[in-house]
């Protein structure tokens, strides 16, 4: 685009006529210099002054402006297109000026319009989908599939024992062999499923729900210990956590289509999952890779071009810290409520002993009734402690792990960006090497240098596409994750409030029933 100096007018700097310009246009240019400041018709409308302002816009300009307007939107936010024509053209001028600023072209808005041809406009990047569109897509991704995990069964004896769970699936989707089926799975099978899904989908920016954490102490008690309340509580927690994990997997449209998921749900016997033990060779290798990734992450300094990702990553990191603090407080609450239940039971026993030794019949009966009330209250405290743990603590624990996976998706996007930047740097070095060969007049090595440049140009293009694709996936995944998180927290908090309300109502009934006994003491 030919552009004059900052103080130069169109009449002082005339560009040469375009090759396809007809003689009549050249004659008009010679007769009226102010109107021939630019041979482009879009530029004419800008520089002709007041006379051109009243001139109606041609359909050609409208066609060239709409793609530029759509392509210049950032962060997936679209404006309504039900605007008047003059507003559209004014908005397009502003957007094109912003684009020219990003291209380091310090020109006037009118000349910015001249710099964009209809062909360039059609090649503009596709607009990002809006959050409303993403939510509509997620509403369409509702699948009629429910999974349940029941009947934890200990198989074997000693340290070789393991627990098998019954996985039941109910669905009307045609991809499955029947509407209802059940298989037996052990904990390592769930870990193996996660490893397979993570290996395939995490590198593309997908948020793969993580399984519950291993518990060496809990499983040791189950394997070698007797069946007691602590072992039963551990198995119930793990069963519920595995059910939530598997339900999140099948609720994800991409994960559900994965053949490993269908095999996990349908196949009677699975090959033994290897590398799931923490002290195995594969487990140690994973720990080493995680440490290496952490170090490499510290060395990457990404120049973020989209403020959405920067702000969202800060929100995720801050939320993870707050959830960890809240989880610690809830765990303390659970322990205190269990201690309260234990002390209430001791209090009830002491009251019963006191009532049995009391000579006053009315007082003895009242103390015995009070002991029974305290025993019922002890049961309420124990139930509420379990509700605190299952409905709050476990939910927070799930989302602490999920937020770590969300951060990993951002990290994977950063790695993809770094690979793109490294390829650009390598391409620049190859071009510099070619220039040195040209300068040194070494034609024998010049062809190889050109081939390498062609190869790295294709790599740069591919890596740029990979970065754009993973950015789109991460944006969509985070939007979906936040929506699911809101629904999940709402459901669990409502259930938790219902348990609290029920507990308080029962407590009031117990005391109301005991009140006549207390008044009857003479």
Swiss-Prot record:
Main location: membrane
Annotated membrane topology: Peripheral membrane protein
Compositionally biased spans, kind Polar residues: 55-65, 98-125
Modification Phosphothreonine occurs at: 41, 48
Amino acids binding a 1,2-diacyl-sn-glycero-3-phospho-(1D-myo-inositol-3-phosphate): 186, 188, 214, 238
GO CC list: cytosol; dendritic spine; early endosome; early endosome membrane; endosome; endosome membrane; extrinsic component of postsynaptic endosome membrane; Golgi apparatus
Biased composition (Acidic residues): 35-45, 132-143
One GO BP annotation of this record: negative regulation of transforming growth factor beta receptor signaling pathway
Region: Membrane-binding amphipathic helix, residue numbers: 281-298
Modification Phosphoserine occurs at: 32, 39, 58, 72, 188, 280
Cellular location(s): Endosome membrane; Golgi apparatus, trans-Golgi network membrane; Early endosome membrane; Cell projection, Lamellipodium
Domain PX span(s) in chain numbering: 143-272
Keyword Zinc applies: no
PTM-bearing positions, type N6-acetyllysine: 237
Disordered: annotated segments: 1-144
UniProt-recorded Gene Ontology molecular function terms: phosphatidylinositol binding
Family under the similarity heading: Belongs to the sorting nexin family.
Domain comment (free text): The BAR domain is able to sense membrane curvature upon dimerization. Membrane remodeling seems to implicate insertion of a N-terminal amphipathic helix (AH) in the membrane.
Subunit structure: Predominantly forms heterodimers with BAR domain-containing sorting nexins SNX5, SNX6 and SNX32. Can self-associate to form homodimers. The heterodimers are proposed to self-assemble into helical arrays on the membrane to stabilize and expand local membrane curvature underlying endosomal tubule formation.
Chain's role: Involved in several stages of intracellular trafficking. Interacts with membranes containing phosphatidylinositol 3-phosphate (PtdIns(3P)) or phosphatidylinositol 3,5-bisphosphate (PtdIns(3,5)P2). Acts in part as component of the retromer membrane-deforming SNX-BAR subcomplex. The SNX-BAR retromer mediates retrograde transport of cargo proteins from endosomes to the trans-Golgi network (TGN) and is involved in endosome-to-plasma membrane transport for cargo protein recycling.
Name of this chain's protein: Sorting nexin-1
Native species: Mus musculus
Encoding gene (name): Snx1
